[in-house]
Each structure stands twice: as C-alpha cells, then as structure tokens.
Amino acid sequence: MFHADRIIVAFDGSENSKKALLTAIDLAKTVNAAITVAHSHDMKDNQTVIDPPRPAAEASYISGGMTSVPDPLISDVTSPEPMIYEDRTEEVIAEARMMLNEQQADGDIDILEGDPAESIIEHANRISADMIVTGSRDQNRLKKLIFGSVSEKLSAKSDIPVLIVK
C-alpha cells in the first residue's frame, strides 16, 4: 500500500492543475498525508519586450524630410508593472485556498520563484515530500517541442515520484 506523509501539488490555476489538486486532496485524505500547494512563477516568463510609444514629434521628423528618427531615451522604455503579476499570483493562491476549503482539507500554500519544474523539485526536497502531483498541460506540438512541459520536466528530473493528472 502507498504511504505518504506529505504531498506537494504544482498549482497554476489552470483546469488541469485544479484536477491535480482535487486528486491530491483525495489521495492525502486516503493516506492521511499533509498537502502543500506550490505556485511557482518565473519572472522571466512575465517580462515582455514592449515597443515603446514614439513621441508625437516623430511625425514631423518624417514629414520634414529627415530619414532617421532619433532613438527614444532609455528612460522612455517602460517595463511591465510587477503589480500585474502579483495580482495574478494572489488570484491563483485564492483559488487554491478556496478549493482546499471546499474540500474541507488543510494545506500549506507556498509561492516559489524561478523555473517552475526546478523550483517545485527543490521545494519538494526541502519539505521532504513523498510525492509531487501535477496536471498535464495541453500545449500545441510546437510549443511543447520548444519549451517542454512542466509535468514532463518534473517526471524527468525528480527523484520523488510524480503523479501526472489528466
């Protein structure tokens, strides 16, 4: 019979991660294990390259016969507001908490940073998890070929058993 003291669930708020959390809750209740919900984000994934707005005066450079437009100052280039990402994290955590409450399950919720697969494996080892539960990711073939999936990386790199829920 399977025995586990702690189960960690990779959770990003997607439908498949919700299925994974429900499966982990059922499994944890069956074997009397503690649950840790881990939401991992990679700040690099949140950063986008923004083509900064050109000053209105640009049109006069072009209409006046100048062939090149001066580059915007570095201070003109803005980066995405980190609050946008923090708001999404809070939303994901609230969803996980609500699901735990609805299922009358206790669990820790931890926010991790870095590559999702690597940070979840490191955290699973740190908390002595006996199993990692994750949802499978529906990706198109090209995206999967280029980036791989978190569930594939978890199963390939983890020494801890990984349950992939579809």
Swiss-Prot record:
Induction, per UniProt: By phosphate starvation, via the alternative sigma factor sigma-B.
Primary gene name: nhaX
Keyword Metal-binding: no
Source organism per UniProt: Bacillus subtilis (strain 168)
PANTHER family: STRESS RESPONSE PROTEIN NHAX, UNIVERSAL STRESS PROTEIN UP12
Keyword annotations: Stress response
Pfam family, one: Usp
This protein's name: Stress response protein NhaX
Family designation: Belongs to the universal stress protein A family.
InterPro entries (UniProt xref): Rossmann-like_a/b/a_fold (IPR014729), Universal_stress_UspA (IPR006015), UspA (IPR006016)
